[in-house]
From Swiss-Prot:
Domain Toprim: start-end pairs: 78-171
Protein name: Recombination protein RecR
Family designation: Belongs to the RecR family.
Sequence intervals crossing the membrane: none
Zinc finger (C4-type): 55-70
Species the sequence originates in: Thermus thermophilus (strain ATCC BAA-163 / DSM 7039 / HB27)
Cross-referenced Pfam families: RecR_C (PF21175), RecR_HhH (PF21176), RecR_ZnF (PF02132), Toprim_4 (PF13662)
Length: 194
């Protein structure tokens, strides 16, 4: 069956997005074709993305020079969480528990992929340390994330900053039976009194 070219173009564009396969892309395109108000709202939102850029301080997404978090005077400026990506920053923000500032590295050390310290936003991090008392290394629990955390811990300690890592543990609602050995071991190491 032949589809209108504009529908095919939209379907191809949608299918390039993460988590959207060809069938889902086609369903979305058809939905938008029959719901013009939603299509216009989506087009307007996509147009607005042209104003989004990296925050000059932390690397988060911003519509101006600074992101809303860096602009927030109520944030604890003595506390800085280092994350690999903006998605990681948003995950920490959703917890509602972290009230400091963030720094987005833009990845993790990965020599096999040619990603060394110079490929990450480290100079920006080191420039931000004045007034920072604690840096939380909130990198992922992968080999690359751990290597990045170890490297940064050494560099930050040389600069006289307290360095911490988030506690490891079991997920809420998770069963011990299904937890891997490393997670269980770290959960036991990090146990605290009740």
């Amino acid at each position: 069956m032949r589809y209108p070219e504009s529908l095919l173009k939209l379907t191809r564009a949608l299918s390039r997005l993460p988590g959207i396969g060809p069938k889902t892309a086609q369903r979305l395109a058809l939905h938008l074709a029959f719901h013009k108000e939603e299509a216009e709202a989506l087009a307007e939102a996509l147009e607005g993305l042209k104003r989004v850029r990296a925050c000059r301080e932390c690397g988060n997404l911003a519509e101006g020079e600074l992101c809303p978090i860096c602009q927030d005077e109520d944030r604890d400026r003595s506390l800085l969480a280092v994350v690999e990506s903006v998605a990681d920053l948003y995950a920490l923000e959703r917890s509602g528990e972290f009230r400091g500032l963030y720094h987005v590295l833009g990845g993790a050390l990965n020599p096999l992929e040619g990603i060394g310290p110079k490929e990450l936003n480290l100079e920006g991090l080191f420039r931000r340390l004045e007034g920072v008392e604690e840096v939380v290394l909130a990198t992922s629990m992968t080999v690359e994330g751990e290597a990045t955390a170890l490297y940064l811990a050494e560099e930050l300690k040389k600069r006289g900053v307290r360095v911490t890592r988030p506690a490891y543990g079991l997920p809420v609602g998770g069963s011990l039976e299904y937890a891997d050995e490393v997670t269980l071991g770290r959960a036991l190491e990090g146990r605290r009194p009740v």
